[in-house]
């Protein structure tokens, strides 16, 4: 069956919330995907920063296969070893006592944080403009992107959005009535936006001064994506709640809210639940964490993430784009013109899958196991792709 045939079947039965996909994939291995037509692509999207170990990693396949063969779903009326082990491993990575609530996604993890904030007895919440925390009604209320919010108004209330990266604006908005501040260490969905150095530390100081919880949404930045287990570790910032998903499950639905100090004690039985949260099969992906550690992937991510930045500075003038933004293997190619969708299509035709979070940004979030040769191949092809897109755009404007 071809890509076109899959697209026709999709159109017949799926709600049109994504648009009709042009590609249908049938197999993956490492950083390579094969579509229904047999074409191979180097994957710089990794399921939107989900497949930390790439596709069909033997350690993950083995762990999940063994777990599903012995115990699948049991509900949270009971406990299972994989769930407890993963929670213990996360607390170990944070290096301080805490408690974990497992769920299925980043949006659900942020809904959990929302509830923890309200359990302080305060109601006001401060979030960032252009921030993204999910599409459920509560997480959408936290999201600072009007285009995503407006079709669903009114949303759960008392959320104030302030400019991202502006510590003084944050300071002015946070008072002793503020329940929590929620921020991304790097804004992913708005274009891989990195705040000024010291911003997260300032947020920690502001929230501590007012008794406000600091929630860091590490759904995209966590689990090694930036070269640290958690991006905030680069600044030594410790939040009251950290939300996780994407790379945590390594390909299966898994999210978590990890709470510390008083935030870890606010929820009691009956306050919250998730039917599939902590599913033993999803939690068997502890092997993701073990493999990242055993294979030295954090250092490798830092090294791979630095190479394209040096390259972009060297060749920026020739190919009309600014130096890459981001950290580790969460990178944004910031174009000087809003041509990112055209670049995405050109890259796809050349055998590379990339993502477009903004009209002028091409996002690279490949598996952490991507080979250096695969990165080099993309970087070698990129100037030609950009030149071709720019030339076609120029011809379209002049009518040539």
Curated annotation (Swiss-Prot):
It catalyses: N(2)-acetyl-L-ornithine + 2-oxoglutarate = N-acetyl-L-glutamate 5-semialdehyde + L-glutamate. The keyword Cytoplasm applies. InterPro entries: AcOrn/SuccOrn_fam, Aminotrans_3, Aminotrans_3_PPA_site, Class-III_PLP-dep_AT, PyrdxlP-dep_Trfase, PyrdxlP-dep_Trfase_major, PyrdxlP-dep_Trfase_small. It is an enzyme of class 2 (transferase). Binds 1 pyridoxal phosphate per subunit. Pathway: Amino-acid biosynthesis; L-arginine biosynthesis; N(2)-acetyl-L-ornithine from L-glutamate: step 4/4. Transmembrane segments: none annotated. Keywords: Amino-acid biosynthesis, Aminotransferase, Arginine biosynthesis, Cytoplasm, Pyridoxal phosphate, Transferase. N(2)-acetyl-L-ornithine binds at residues 135, 274. GO terms for cellular component: cytoplasm. Pfam families: Aminotran_3. It is found in: Cytoplasm. GO terms for biological process: L-arginine biosynthetic process. CDD domains: OAT_like. GO terms for molecular function: identical protein binding; N2-acetyl-L-ornithine:2-oxoglutarate 5-aminotransferase activity; pyridoxal phosphate binding. It comes from the Bacteria. Its EC number is 2.6.1.11. Pyridoxal 5'-phosphate binds at residues 106-107, 132, 217-220, 275. The modification N6-(pyridoxal phosphate)lysine is found at residue 246. Its cofactor is pyridoxal 5'-phosphate. Homodimer. Belongs to the class-III pyridoxal-phosphate-dependent aminotransferase family. ArgD subfamily. May also have succinyldiaminopimelate aminotransferase activity, thus carrying out the corresponding step in lysine biosynthesis. NCBIfam families: argD, PRK03244.1. This is Acetylornithine aminotransferase. It comes from Streptomyces clavuligerus. The lineage of its organism: Bacteria, Bacillati, Actinomycetota, Actinomycetes, Kitasatosporales.
């Amino acid at each position: 069956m071809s890509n076109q045939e899959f697209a026709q079947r999709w159109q017949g039965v799926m709600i049109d919330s994504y648009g009709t996909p042009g590609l249908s994939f049938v197999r993956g291995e490492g950083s390579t995907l094969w579509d229904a037509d047999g074409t191979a692509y180097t994957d710089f999207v990794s399921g939107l920063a989900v497949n930390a170990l790439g596709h069909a990693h033997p350690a993950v396949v083995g762990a999940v296969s063994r777990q599903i063969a012995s115990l699948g779903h049991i509900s949270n009326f009971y406990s299972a070893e994989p769930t407890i082990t993963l929670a213990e491993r996360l607390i170990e990575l944070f290096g301080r006592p805490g408690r974990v609530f497992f769920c299925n996604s980043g949006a659900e993890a942020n809904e959990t944080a929302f509830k923890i904030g309200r359990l302080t007895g305060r109601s006001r919440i401060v979030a960032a403009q252009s921030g993204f925390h999910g599409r459920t009604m509560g997480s959408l209320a936290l999201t600072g992107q009007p285009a995503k919010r407006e079709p669903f108004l009114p949303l759960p209330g008392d959320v104030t959005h302030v400019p991202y990266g502006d510590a003084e604006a944050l300071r002015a908005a946070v008072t002793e009535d503020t329940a929590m501040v929620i921020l991304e260490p790097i804004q992913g969905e708005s274009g891989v936006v990195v705040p000024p150095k010291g911003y997260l530390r300032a947020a920690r100081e502001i929230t501590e001064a007012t008794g406000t919880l600091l929630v860091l949404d590490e759904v995209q930045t966590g689990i090694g994506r930036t070269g640290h287990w958690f991006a905030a570790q680069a600044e030594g910032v410790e939040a009251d709640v950290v939300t996780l998903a994407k790379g945590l499950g390594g390909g299966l639905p898994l999210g978590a809210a990890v709470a510390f100090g008083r935030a870890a004690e606010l929820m009691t039985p009956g306050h919250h639940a998730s039917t599939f949260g902590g599913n033993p099969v999803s939690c068997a992906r502890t092997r993701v964490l073990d493999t990242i550690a055993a294979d030295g992937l954090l250092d490798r991510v830092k090294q791979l993430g630095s190479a394209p930045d040096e390259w972009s500075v060297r060749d920026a003038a020739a190919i009309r784009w600014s130096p890459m933004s981001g950290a580790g293997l969460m990178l944004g190619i910031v174009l000087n013109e809003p041509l990112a969708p055209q670049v995405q299509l050109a890259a796809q035709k050349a055998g590379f899958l990339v993502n477009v979070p903004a009209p002028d940004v091409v996002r690279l979030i490949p598996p952490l196991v991507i080979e250096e040769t695969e990165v080099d191949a993309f970087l070698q092809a990129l100037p030609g792709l950009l030149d071709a897109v720019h030339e076609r755009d120029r011809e379209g404007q002049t009518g040539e």
